[in-house]
Amino acid sequence: MATTASNHYNLLGSGSSIVHADPGGMQQAQSYRDAQTLVQSDYTLQSNGHPLSHAHQWITALSHGDGAPWATSPLGQQDIKPTVQSSRDELHVSGTLQHQSRAPHLVHPAHGNHHGPGAWRSTGSTHLSSMASSNGQGLLYSQPSFTVNGMINPGSGQGIHHHGLRDSHDDHHGDHGHQQVSQAQQQHSQLQGGHQDHSDEDTPTSDDLEQFAKQFKQRRIKLGFTQADVGLALGTLYGNVFSQTTICRFEALQLSFKNMCKLKPLLNKWLEEADSSSGSPTSIDKIAAQGRKRKKRTSIEVSVKGALESHFLKCPKPSAPEITSLADSLQLEKEVVRVWFCNRRQKEKRMTPPGGTIPGAEDIYGASRDTPPHLGVQTSVQ
């Protein structure tokens, strides 16, 4: 019993050398079965015939033995060491089968009898492949997995094939995307270049604008249109209403270069339309004639003006019925008579100095009872 316990202790002490043993020196499956039988027969204690674990046997041996150091024999080490190594390998194979059943992976093991040596090798390769897949999916496709005794896993060839397909697909997709990007850049550069050429051709220079403004002013005056007529005609024809000030500043080259470039084509179209319709009444002539609906300057005859002046001396501010009757008698419009009286009163105010009277006002209004009250002239009523 002491010899068995000492052998067990030596077994636990030499665990590190057993773990790092070379996989190439493993024996066949039949020797593993004999070793397992031998281990079970050696490790069976008086506990209902069940084999105990290594740790439990070591603890039992320590509890039953004395504190003296155990003696070891080279013969016992030679007999037990292969047995323990074979038992550890058998436990590793069973753990691999359990790991395979718990965590299935992409690589499938080879089909066949699992009781032979080939089955053990396929199981080991499956274990290594599953470790590679658990560490990272890229390892499964990037490089083949080598197993015990230098054998290549059957699934590694398929992984290499998938790697090639993936690379070819990526290369094809990358080339296709690169071609699309290059074509898009080429089209963008062509459009940009065409836009630049087009803008360079359409953009006039400062000399062109100056020459066009001078010609436009001469032709406008020759055709008989004012600057206000041109601005109104542009608004009616093209939808852009421009004021007289804008047209004047264009002719004087006082607008910005950008605004001059925008206004030049519109004025050029208006000139072409005006030249083509010169000598015949067209829509431009009608629009220019309408203008801003300014009223004509009324010219009053001398006889009519004298009658209005005599009436103003009598009543500088007539009422609405008096204006209507006077307009009918003189054959004038009511609005013309009203405006004339307004202008005449404003003229009278300008002629009267502040706080004084007009020289000779006594002679003018002396015999008249219709003296304007604002002159302050007192006359006796006859």
Curated annotation (Swiss-Prot):
Entry keywords, A to Z: Developmental protein, DNA-binding, Homeobox, Nucleus, Transcription, Transcription regulation
DNA-binding region positions on the chain: 293-352
GO biological process per UniProt: brain development; regulation of transcription by RNA polymerase II
Gene Ontology CC annotations of this record: nucleus
Cystine residue pairs: none
Primary localization class, coarse: nucleus
Protein name: POU domain, class 3, transcription factor 2-A
Species classification: Eukaryota, Metazoa, Chordata, Craniata, Vertebrata
